[in-house]
């Protein structure tokens, strides 16, 4: 018995108000019937391809290349389409053109002797690639992706079969007219961008867009204009969101990390943060201090900074680190429920002995005891200069329009977790007890765990940024955003402590250790993953948890696929700082209609070499899970929405046919 036969005049009575509204969009039986036919057709198309990336860490060049080449998918399609009919070098040239059309066109025009002939060949090739990547979508969806100025022409080229007699002549006329009207360059660029767009239907970014790398702001520029994406916030994203919300501790941490990795461009050029007051103060305060422990971590071949600038960054790094320790103490004192007293360490320093007595009762020698702005009598009090610097930095952060735009984008398209097509996506952790049960976490005197914890945390982050200054909930929310960065029960962190002070000032490696929460070991167990999937209401025969946050040590043989395929960890080390640790330069998890594939990337050289020499990211593909039957739109979340729409339209048809609602004249 089909769904329509089960609909009767009696069963639709309670839906009449909604059906009356629906009738305005579909005023006749013909309109409603046509929409049902269209939606049923969509249900039987293959699902769109989803790409999952994590822990981009400001590596703009590698990120944009992975988007442009669709993690190697475009190269595979070019090989499938042209096979042995093109030389390897010709296929490489075509791929480079698709990835970087504007730049490649400039190079071609500088060397090509018969440009019109090149245009004819290239346009025909691009049309074939475009036909291939658009074949799994409805014409309506493809049409919505087209640039307006070329929409009609591209549709004609995509939907005409050159194998049919007389059609090739028609296509040839279109192409020759494009060339003769001097629109070939613009048309090629439009086709290449369309190929990129259609190859990735949905992009999921599992957090940590910020930190370490030189250009998180440029990644955000791409994402804010991207056609279909979502973000699951990572700890570094939350840190920047806290800075934009006015949390001085978050600002100090953002600045410290920028100095640590010598990445000032995002702050100064990207967001217009004025670092001059900090630089002036640091150079005066530490004029005779080499600040050896605070030299930025930059690669030897990096010529961005000279020795003088590197020393200045080291001085700024030390200055902001001390300010950070003082600011954090203010929150720890103000929020005893955070239980972070062990992170207040400045008062434990014996400046005469140049030692510190740690919370474990043992005394340790300091690697650096020159802290002229720390008053032993009141070690956590900011000096007048430090307070003035933070006031200026505070104004810089909260008044940056570019930063506001990017953070609003993160709020609009992001959250702590996402459930998508039987996959549970979150960046780091769900706090667990040792026995694998959900851990109760106290927030403002109330207990939260699992899904409720992530939703509460998400609400607090939004309150910190969006609430008015006089909102009584805002001060706690602003403080809690910092806790999410480094607190032991934070689902974005989930370690016993963040040993920042110890890593700078103490040589004992055992004090640097940050003990991970139980989640990170228990997620290897299938039953724990199933419990978490149930907690978040994830349904489906093949359901998974997808995480980032912890780099997968591929070089040591670690497998990113865990818990009998239920858990996928896709932090493969986009950040250059992690390449030696992971042995690779990032993962892309690809979920298409045939199943899951994990694409493992080797380091990206540079955009310049990609354009000039056709150097692509070398990627290897591991099949994770393949379906015996192709997954269609009807098997996805979107498909379930469409089925609901179809059922509503069938109810509207019944209302029309039984006279409960009158058809409207047009």
From Swiss-Prot:
Pathway: Carbohydrate biosynthesis; gluconeogenesis. It comes from Phocaeicola vulgatus (strain ATCC 8482 / DSM 1447 / JCM 5826 / CCUG 4940 / NBRC 14291 / NCTC 11154) (Bacteroides vulgatus). Keywords: Carbohydrate metabolism, Hydrolase, Manganese. Pfam families: FBPase_2 (PF06874). Gene3D superfamilies: 3.60.21.10. It catalyses: beta-D-fructose 1,6-bisphosphate + H2O = beta-D-fructose 6-phosphate + phosphate. This is Fructose-1,6-bisphosphatase class 3. GO terms for biological process: gluconeogenesis.
């Amino acid at each position: 018995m089909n769904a329509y036969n089960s609909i009767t005049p009696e069963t639709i009575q309670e839906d009449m108000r909604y059906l009356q509204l629906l009738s305005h969009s579909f005023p006749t039986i013909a309109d409603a019937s046509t929409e049902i036919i269209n939606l049923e057709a969509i249900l039987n198309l293959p699902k769109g391809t989803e790409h999952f990336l994590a822990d981009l860490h400001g590596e703009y060049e590698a990120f944009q290349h992975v988007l442009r080449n669709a993690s190697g998918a475009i190269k595979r399609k070019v090989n499938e389409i042209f096979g042995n009919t093109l030389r390897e070098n010709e296929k490489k040239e075509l791929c480079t053109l698709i990835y970087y059309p504007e730049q490649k066109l400039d190079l071609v025009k500088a060397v090509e002797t018969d440009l019109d002939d090149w245009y004819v060949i290239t346009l025909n090739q691009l049309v074939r690639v475009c036909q291939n990547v658009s074949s799994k979508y409805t014409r309506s969806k493809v049409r919505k992706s087209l640039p307006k100025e070329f929409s009609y022409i591209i549709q004609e080229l995509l939907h005409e079969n050159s194998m049919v007699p007389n059609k090739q002549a028609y296509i040839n006329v279109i192409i020759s007219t494009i060339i003769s009207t001097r629109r070939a360059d613009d048309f090629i660029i439009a086709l290449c961008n369309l190929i990129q767009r259609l190859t990735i239907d949905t992009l999921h970014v599992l957090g940590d867009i910020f930190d370490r790398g030189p250009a998180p702001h440029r990644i955000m520029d791409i994402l804010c204009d991207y056609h279909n994406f979502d973000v699951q916030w990572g700890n570094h994203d939350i840190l920047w969101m806290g800075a934009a919300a006015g949390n001085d501790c978050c600002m100090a941490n953002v600045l410290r990390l920028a100095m640590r990795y010598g990445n000032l461009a995002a702050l100064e050029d990207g967001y217009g943060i004025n670092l001059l007051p900090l630089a002036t103060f640091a150079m005066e305060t530490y004029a005779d201090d080499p600040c050896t422990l605070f030299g930025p971590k930059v690669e030897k071949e990096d010529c961005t900074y000279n020795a003088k600038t590197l020393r200045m960054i080291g001085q700024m790094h030390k200055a902001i680190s001390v300010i950070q320790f003082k600011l954090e103490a203010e929150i720890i004192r103000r929020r005893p429920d955070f239980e972070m007293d062990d992170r207040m360490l400045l008062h434990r320093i014996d400046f005469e002995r140049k030692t510190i007595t740690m919370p474990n009762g043992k005394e340790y020698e300091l690697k650096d005891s020159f802290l002229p702005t720390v008053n032993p009598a009141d070690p956590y009090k900011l000096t007048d200069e430090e307070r003035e610097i933070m006031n200026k930095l505070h104004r810089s952060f909260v008044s940056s329009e570019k930063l506001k735009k990017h953070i609003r984008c993160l709020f609009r398209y992001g959250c702590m977790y996402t459930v998508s097509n039987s996959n549970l996506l979150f960046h780091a952790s769900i706090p667990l007890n040792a026995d694998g049960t959900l851990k109760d976490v106290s927030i403002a005197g109330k207990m939260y765990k699992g899904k409720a914890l992530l939703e509460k945390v998400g609400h607090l982050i939004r309150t910190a940024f969006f609430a008015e200054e006089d909102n009584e909930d805002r001060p706690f929310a602003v403080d809690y955003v910092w806790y999410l960065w480094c607190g032991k029960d934070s689902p974005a962190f989930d370690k016993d402590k963040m040993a920042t002070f110890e890593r700078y000032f103490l040589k004992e490696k055992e004090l640097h250790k940050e003990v991970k929460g139980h989640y990170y070991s228990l997620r290897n167990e299938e039953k724990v993953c199933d419990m978490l999937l149930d907690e978040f209401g994830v349904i489906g025969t093949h359901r998974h948890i997808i995480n980032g946050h912890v780099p997968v040590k591929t070089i040591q043989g670690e497998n990113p696929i865990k818990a009998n395929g239920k858990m996928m960890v896709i932090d493969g080390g986009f950040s250059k700082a992690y390449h030696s640790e992971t042995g690779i330069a990032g993962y892309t998890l690809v979920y298409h209609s045939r199943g899951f594939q994990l694409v493992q990337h080797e380091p990206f050289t540079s955009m310049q070499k990609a354009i000039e020499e056709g150097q692509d990211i070398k990627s290897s593909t591991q099949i994770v899970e393949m379906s015996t039957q192709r997954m269609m739109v009807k098997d996805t979340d979107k498909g379930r929405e469409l089925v609901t729409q179809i059922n509503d339209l069938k109810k509207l048809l019944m209302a029309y046919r039984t006279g409960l609602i009158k058809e409207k004249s047009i």
